Amino acid sequence: MATTLTLSEAVTALQQGGVIAYPTEAVWGLGCDPRQETAVHTLLNIKQRASGKGLILVTAELNTLQDWLDLDTLSPERLHEVQASWPGPHTWVLPASTRAPHWITGHHNGLAVRISAHPLVSALCRAWNMALISTSANVAGQSPARRREDLDPSLLPHLAGIVDGPTGGLAQPTSIRDARSGHILRL
């Protein structure tokens, strides 16, 4: 069984390239340091997920990602729409800058970002002072865990630990929209 981590222990695990599990708005998530390519590949291997799909970043402050984003390419109206939806359960695919790591964007020219209103996710990101990879805690193609006790036992030996707490109670994972077009990619 993976160890339960405090926020400061989770930050240490992330700094060391570890993958952690934590509750999100609807399901349990897996996260790691998005700046560490090895950590991201470890997470992808745990999930058995293709690297080309891209990954979501969750953060407490958009400015933690300013070097990876090209927000000047969005219309003022669209940028206002994005910012007005946060914090909240809305993920937006924002225009990525050339500095955005390819191991996060996958085969895309955008970066999927959510500023979470979930208290634990927000506290974790603030303690970490950086964005965090946020992908469902399950093997690709399997159902995501809605409770800690539902985490797939095959994932646990590969985790640096678990930040315990309740999910946000949403019935479905967060929506994903393209910030350039406004199109809904996942409802």
UniProtKB/Swiss-Prot annotation:
One of its GO terms (biological process) is tRNA threonylcarbamoyladenosine modification. One of its GO terms (cellular component) is cytoplasm. Residues 4-187 form the YrdC-like domain. GO terms for molecular function: ATP binding; double-stranded RNA binding; L-threonylcarbamoyladenylate synthase; tRNA binding. Keywords: ATP-binding, Cytoplasm, Nucleotide-binding, Nucleotidyltransferase, Transferase, tRNA processing. Its EC number is 2.7.7.87. Gene3D superfamilies: DHBP synthase (3.90.870.10). It is an enzyme of class 2 (transferase). It is found in: Cytoplasm. It holds the Pfam family Sua5_yciO_yrdC. Signal peptide: none annotated. Its main location: cytoplasm. It catalyses: L-threonine + hydrogencarbonate + ATP = L-threonylcarbamoyladenylate + diphosphate + H2O. Required for the formation of a threonylcarbamoyl group on adenosine at position 37 (t(6)A37) in tRNAs that read codons beginning with adenine. Catalyzes the conversion of L-threonine, HCO(3)(-)/CO(2) and ATP to give threonylcarbamoyl-AMP (TC-AMP) as the acyladenylate intermediate, with the release of diphosphate. PANTHER family: SUA5 (PTHR17490), THREONYLCARBAMOYL-AMP SYNTHASE (PTHR17490:SF18). Belongs to the SUA5 family. TsaC subfamily. This is Threonylcarbamoyl-AMP synthase. It comes from Xylella fastidiosa (strain M12). The lineage of its organism: Bacteria, Pseudomonadati, Pseudomonadota, Gammaproteobacteria, Lysobacterales.
